[in-house]
């Protein structure tokens, strides 16, 4: 389900129910929406990481007398975690970009504040500042991801492990 649809459904639908005890804060529902959407993304990344570990790794651990849980804990999961770090950082970059979507609820975040300032001053440089802020966060994260991938590739080649 698209992120904006989840934000709209929860951000407008939940407060409209009028049920006592349910928060009506738009910021609360914006955060809940982003958490729900990105939890689904992250769980898929981890699932793919676990499935990417060759079944022979589990079989070798089981042949050494490890239980299924021990095999997962000591053999499969550590290998999977190494493989999922770059995709997780990509998801984090996507999350940082998707925060601008919460403005549809009226929550004032960076892009919405930029629109307010630009409308008041008729000065387009506010958009330049907002873009610079997004770029200043995104580019270092992208470089970190590239560095981690290159480091992992180098370690695998040094160990003679096929990628």
Q: How would you name each of these model-derived features?
A:
Residues 1-163:
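Transmembrane alpha-helices and adjacent helix-loop boundaries
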